[in-house]
Structures are given as structure tokens and as C-alpha cells.
């Protein structure tokens, strides 16, 4: 986590809050350690808190649930529930009154509730976890393939592209494909799927990698 922050030109002490989406180790692993070490406020659902089962003493711990909004400095953070195999998973949009950033990873489907929560985003980070053919041909056991592709799993490249097509692109200026599987996807496959929807629209398409993430983006509203 610290290395990734450093790549973005930040230090852990620069953080105003840490928001945990759910309890799976690849999402919550370093959050408590950083929060304790640098006295950073934590936000998560109560279900995530219960599932983590850790000692949060000495940490400013805040709970949020579907539909809640809370402030972090000048940003309004809005929580919404998603379809994932976790206790009480959430995703978030962030709004400063001028521009809105939405994030959607770790969901096996896009419900009308999710679509409404992500309305009027200027930038969207969306999960492109796997290529369907790569997953089908992978060495993963059958049960794991079913878990990944279920409605409580992850979005494929095609699912992400389908959502973008149905959701509309009128306000979007940046789309970031994220949470790519290292075994069942390739950045170029994710980008091709999104590019096919974007077409000739003036929208920047970026694919985040597990190693490098993505660079800072300046957002402006309509």
C-alpha cells in the first residue's frame, strides 16, 4: 500500500480517510495497519467490521451503509450496496459539488440500484475482472470459475462494456477499467471491450494494472 501511494506522489500520512469496501484480504489487508500507524479515520459497513474480526482499538472507526452519505474534507462520499460474496459489501461515488467520480468493482451484476447510484458521473472506475474465454479455458477449478462468473462474483470485460452501453456516456469524460485478473484477463482485452462502446466519443479510456494502478486524473464537471 505504501509503495503504491509513493508511486502516486503521496505518503500514508497524507490520507484523510481510508474507505474499506468489503472484508476480502486484497481489499482490507493493510487498512487497519495504516489507520493505526498514521491515525487515519476508517470507514466501512458494520458487516465488513464484523467479518474482519480485528481489534480496532485506537482507531477512529466509522460505519456506513447503503444510501449513506458522509463528508471527507470537501468531498461528499455516497455509499451503495453491490452484489458480491461478502458480508455487507459497498461501493462509493465521490462528489465535490463540481464533478463526480464513481467506482464499481467486486460485483457480479449491475442492478438498477447501482446504475442509479452512478448516474451523472464525470469519471467512472469500473471492474473488468476477466475475459470470459480466458476464464473458461483457465486452469481454475470449476467451482472457482462459477464463483467468479456468478451474480455474486465479478464483472467480465463484456459485462462492463454492456453496462456502459446501457448506462449511457453523455457526461463521462474518463473511464478506468480496473480490478483485472492477472490470470484471466489482459489489459488490451479490457480496453478493446470498452473502446468498442466509447467509439468516437471524446472519452479517455485508461486501464489500471495491479502493479501500477493509474495516474492522477483531473476531473471537471459539465
What are these regions (language model features)?
Residues 29-38, 54-55, 185-192:
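Metal-dependent catalytic neighborhoods of phosphoester/phosphodiester hydrolases
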Residues 43, 62-65, 78, 206-208:
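General small-molecule cofactor/ligand-binding pocket signal
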Residues 16-23, 43-46, 102-105, 125-127, ...:
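Active-site neighborhood of phospho(di)ester-bond hydrolases with catalytic His/Asp-centered motifs
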Residues 24-28, 49-51, 86-87, 110-112, ...:
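Active-site environment of divalent metal-dependent phosphoester hydrolases
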Amino acid at each position: 500500500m505504501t509503495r503504491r501511494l509513493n508511486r502516486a506522489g503521496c505518503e500514508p500520512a497524507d490520507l484523510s480517510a481510508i474507505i474499506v469496501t468489503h472484508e476480502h484480504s486484497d481489499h482490507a489487508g493493510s487498512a487497519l495497519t495504516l489507520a493505526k500507524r498514521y491515525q487515519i479515520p476508517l470507514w466501512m459497513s458494520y458487516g465488513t467490521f464484523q467479518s474482519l474480526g480485528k481489534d480496532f482499538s485506537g482507531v477512529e472507526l466509522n460505519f456506513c451503509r447503503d444510501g449513506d452519505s458522509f463528508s471527507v474534507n470537501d468531498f461528499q462520499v455516497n455509499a451503495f450496496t453491490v452484489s458480491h460474496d461478502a458480508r455487507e459489501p459497498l461501493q462509493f461515488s465521490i462528489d465535490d459539488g463540481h464533478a463526480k467520480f464513481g467506482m464499481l468493482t467486486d460485483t457480479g451484476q449491475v442492478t438498477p440500484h447501482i446504475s442509479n447510484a452512478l448516474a451523472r458521473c464525470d469519471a467512472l472506475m469500473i471492474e473488468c475482472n476477466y475475459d470470459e474465454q480466458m476464464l473458461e479455458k483457465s486452469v481454475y477449478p470449476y467451482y472457482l470459475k462459477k464463483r467468479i462468473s456468478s451474480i455474486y462474483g465479478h464483472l467480465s470485460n463484456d459485462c462492463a462494456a454492456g453496462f456502459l452501453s446501457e448506462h449511457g456516456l453523455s457526461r463521462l469524460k474518463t473511464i478506468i477499467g480496473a480490478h483485472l485478473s492477472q490470470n484471466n484477463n489482459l489489459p488490451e482485452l479490457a480496453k478493446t471491450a470498452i473502446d468498442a462502446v466509447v467509439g468516437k466519443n471524446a472519452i479517455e479510456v485508461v486501464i489500471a494494472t495491479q502493479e501500477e494502478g493509474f495516474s492522477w486524473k483531473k476531473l471537471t464537471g459539465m
